[in-house]
């Protein structure tokens, strides 16, 4: 009797497997993938933007890759639109004593390639082209911790590269991360959406990330 029950159970499980496989097949016999579902996927609700108050002596602005090669009305118009507001935040934060650190992205680019409106002040660090994560192959972590920095504000022309990867890397290193969504940009809207979603939901990262707007940052 037990053998019969076992056999019946096995048949039922096999039948269920067939049904499941049938449900995830598409015409042609290939398994359904996220790519097949791309056009019908629903966007998650937008993350909340929160007002933040920064302590200048414990805060560093990471002004990443705002250069003539990457940020212009022709090359990346969404970046060009963000520059005046980013400039205002940088000027105010610098005047209040916050640390400002720059980076350039394109191989061969130097500090003089940074946009005129965001020109570094004398003595401000400019990181060379390092790739998406500005902590890799640099002394950025040691510099920040050596100056008592607890919070970084991630600003950048390439949301899905420098802002996403440097912001996540900072969070994983124990820094609080502020991301003004109007201070990051890309070639299109989706990379900005993805960056905001990832930073606000990823395990071990989201707990240290605050999404905000530039006009919601106070001192």
What is each residue range found by the language model?
Residues 30-60, 108-219:
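Active-site-adjacent betaalpha module
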Residues 10, 28-29:
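Residue-identity detector for glycine
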Residues 75-93, 98-101:
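A short alpha/beta connector and helix-capping loop motif
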Residues 14-24:
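Bacterial N-terminal signal peptides
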Residues 63-64, 98-105, 180:
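Short beta-strand segments at enzyme active-site cores
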Residues 33-40, 71-80:
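Acidic/histidine-rich helix-loop elements
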Residues 62-73:
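Acidic/histidine-rich, surface-exposed loop or edge segments in extracytoplasmic proteins
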Residues 2-16:
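Bacterial N-terminal signal peptides that target proteins for export
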